[in-house]
Amino acid sequence: MSIGLSIVSCKKDSFLSEHWNHPLSTQRNPEVQLTQIESNLDPKQCANCHENQFKAWQSSFHAKSIGNGILWQKEILSFEEWNRCLHCHSPLPETKAEISETFQTHEILDSKRKHFPSGISNPSIQCASCHIRNQIWYGPPSRNLTANQLTTLQANLPHNGFKVQEEFESSAFCQSCHESPESGQKLNGKHLMEVYQEWENTSFAKKGIQCQNCHMPNRDHTWKGIHDPDFVRAGLQPSWSLTRTANGEIQIDAKLKSIGIGHKFPTYLIPKVYLRFFGKNQFGNRKLIEESILGRLVNTNLTEEYYDTRITPGNSHNVSFRFTLDEKAIKTLDWEIEVDPDEHYIRSFEESLREKGNLLSAETKKQLQLSLSEKKDSRYVLFTLSLPVPVSLPK
């Protein structure tokens, strides 16, 4: 059973079609003359001029795309499945050669020795994964120089400067690894990943707001997302009210509105968001009264969708219910919103450990256990709101 998602898609743009034509070619290009320093593609080398981007990348999930969570799966996937995962998790053939025998050809190993002379300590998504093809550097338009000024300076820039591609500021650039292919598996009429399509049909797209505007503000290379509490909070607005009904019950009306998210929240089938309502006594002890779950719940075999309660951009998830109050016990009501960024992975990994644990090698089992622990630790409380119990008016 493959736990990873196959996410190589087709693209309309000719540059992007070539740029993300997997498997990528090696960096060998005899027509380009570079010094040894310039041809060294280690991210640490890029940091000599791009220190801020390097430091941001180090803390990003792109820099952790080859970790325990994917490495343990190599033992249970076919060669074809494993290599398909690497198209996005480790795009360069030189980095793939570190973790896949398929890419340990003479040509690729020769390119790896030349362009990574100190070796590859981290075969994840690197600077060159997005910015370099055949020893030609690509990037977005300069924010400080005109096209003519940049052309004049190119000859004096390291690695012959770079070719400007506006696609680096387009959502389509991200589509390759964040959208299922058109021919990909569907559940209940929806692909496993549709974040680009979700965005494409929104006011965000109509206004020209791209993925990069939110996930790479000021060209920041941390690519914040569902795992970052502050980032998520900025896109949501919770509101609620308590009223006492004529028969003495408490009516709760709660609304979580998507105010700054350009796709469904949460996107993909991996995260879940729990809206929980508690009654709290004078000692601070809480009792769960009601729970509502946001997300797309799919079985671990990726063959059946149970529900999809995600919020579309600009809309809300509403929860309304009544309950009978024990006035002596409950003084305050709490609304807590908890995010589990890796819920589907946790469920899948727990099942794999339970059913396959004894069949895995010791190293692979340890990788699975470590990844499972890491993903369980990713949960966080997004909001906690409290309201006093409405007073009972005298009759």
For each of these PLM feature ranges, what is it?
Residues 200-207, 212-213, 217-395:
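Short, conserved sequence motifs used for protein processing/export or organelle targeting and
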Residues 131, 178, 215, 219:
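Short Cys/His-centered divalent metal-binding micro-motifs
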Residues 167-170, 223-225:
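Outer-membrane beta-barrel translocator/pore domains, especially the C-terminal barrels
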Residues 10-168, 176, 182-204:
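Sequence context of c-type cytochrome heme-c attachment sites
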Residues 1-6:
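Bacterial N-terminal signal peptides
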